């Protein structure tokens, strides 16, 4: 908490500026949902359940999951791995949904979509976000 207080207390910190900018410019319901999902679901209750499951199963249960819904990408960034793998590697909607559902049972509510370019599958990701609206 000391680090968080230090960052939030410094008005010149870029992270503090971004947080305040988000509160000023985003719809209040969006901010509320993100704070609840990240702070409560992922942070408080989720982390507690993750710790319990680490002890119960005797293995590392992560707090966050990085998922690559697709290797497809329309950006062609220099040095990026996605161009080497082509556009055909995709997790199905059922596989993505199953990963999130099973992760939530372990206490994981924080997901980072990587890839390729995840927004190539924007419709699918939005469907997952609506179904799993307690995740960040």
Predicted regions and their residues:
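Conserved alpha-helical substructure of the radical SAM core
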Residues: 1-135
